[in-house]
Structure formats: structure tokens, C-alpha cells
Amino acid sequence: MPTPYRVLRSVACDADIEAIFDHLFQSYRDLGDPTTDALTRAAARVRGIEDALAALGDVPFQGPMPPDILPGIRPVPRDGAVYYYIADETLSELRVLAVFFGGQDHRNHILRRILSGAGPQG
């Protein structure tokens, strides 16, 4: 079995995960969950997202490479989230550029992020 790629998270990816947590927490509160329950549920969901993100390194070349976004970028959906990443075969690394959740227009979000200069390092 091949060695998994090291998974690196961009600053934007970390911000995405924080925003997902905030969104989930507020949604659970709006639906009537007590604060502690909403925190617990949001944290559990985000742990699942982070686990799926880490597992991307096990199969780094999954998903299509849309030619009109950024060379080498791959969007991969998992359990309600879409992960955008670039795998570097030479370094055996996978850089996660973004994580979008739910019904977001993730394609337009990643295009705006790239055009704003966030690029692969952002």
C-alpha cells in the first residue's frame, strides 16, 4: 500500500472550517438546541469534516481536475462538504485550499478566491 500524502491546510481552509463551525452552531441554536448541545453537535460535525480532510492524503488523486479553474486543482465532495486541493507528487503532499459546506456555490467561491489572489498558498 502506498504511503499517504502529507495533508497541509491553507490559512483559507482553516478559516473555512471555523466558518462552518460557526454556521452549524448558529443553525443548531436557531433550531432550538440549548447552547451546550449546539456546541457538541457542531464540534462533532466539524471533527467529521476534519477527519475526511485528513483522509484525502490516502487517495490523493481522486476527483476530476476541472481545466478552467486552476491547473492541478481537484474538488472532492464528502458528506456535505466539498474539498478543493492540489496534490504534489514530487513532495508527496496535498494542499487543501478550501472547504465548502452545504448548498454553497463552491465553484464560484473557489474561483473568486483564486482571482482575489489567495491562490494555492492562500
Language model features with spans:
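A short, surface-exposed loop/turn module that caps and links secondary-structure elements
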Residues: 50-77
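Short, flexible helix/strand-to-coil boundary loops that buttress conserved ligand/catalytic motifs
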Residues: 21-24, 60, 110
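Arg/Lys-rich, positively charged N-terminal/basic patches that mediate binding to nucleic acids
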Residues: 1-46, 122
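Generic structural signal for secondary-structure transition and capping sites
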Residues: 29, 54, 58-61, 81, ...
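GIY-YIG nuclease signature motif recognition
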Residues: 13, 49, 85
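Conserved protein kinase catalytic domain
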Residues: 21, 50-53, 100
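Enriched for short, Lys/Arg-rich terminal
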Residues: 73-76, 81-122
